[in-house]
Amino acid sequence: MGLKPDKWIREKSLNEAMITPFCEGLVGEGVVSYGLSSYGYDIRVSDEFKIFTNINAEVVDPKDFNENNVVDFKGDICIVPPNSFALARTVEYFRMPKDTLAICLGKSTYARCGIIVNVTPFEPGFEGHITIEISNTTPLPAKIYANEGIAQVLFLEGDEQCETTYSDRKGKYQSQTGITLPRILKQQ
């Protein structure tokens, strides 16, 4: 399994629409950087957010998530409250090759401000926008800039294709658009 370079990412994105829209260079002046880098792709956060709130004194339950736990926000700058959390999505839409897994890590610009970004792996065959989890670990409000970089994606190509891809097993987040809240498959 090898880490894929910029040339591979560019070819997959331009020829197979692995990342759309795709930015061929790294954009970084006056913004939190995004676009193609040496061994990865810096994704952008869209202008749609779901900010966690405690106004209803609900318990967060991943098996029975109550949408009253979040407040929808759309704008160029999202303020994440102190010691709080927001969900967002990428500007980019991904179509993962059947032999490739992607891992996403937060950007140092935000990490150095106490903002932690968590994204689960992009499995082989996955398609959709990526839901991003943003934690403000500081005792102060934190700004998140829409349409700018939020995290870096690293692509790992397997030595061989897996037997069952995310799309083959009809993963519950397949083809997601927008910010997708937790889902649990119902027993039949």
UniProtKB/Swiss-Prot annotation:
The active site is at E133. Gene3D superfamilies: 2.70.40.10. Pathway: Pyrimidine metabolism; dUMP biosynthesis; dUMP from dCTP (dUTP route): step 1/2. GO terms for molecular function: dCTP deaminase activity; nucleotide binding. Its EC number is 3.5.4.13. It catalyses: dCTP + H2O + H(+) = dUTP + NH4(+). DCTP binds at K107, S108, T109, Y110, A111, R112, Q152, Y166, Q176. Keywords: Hydrolase, Nucleotide metabolism, Nucleotide-binding. Coiled coil: none annotated. PANTHER family: DCTP DEAMINASE. HAMAP family: dCTP_deaminase. Belongs to the dCTP deaminase family. Homotrimer. NCBIfam families: dCTP_deam. This is dCTP deaminase.
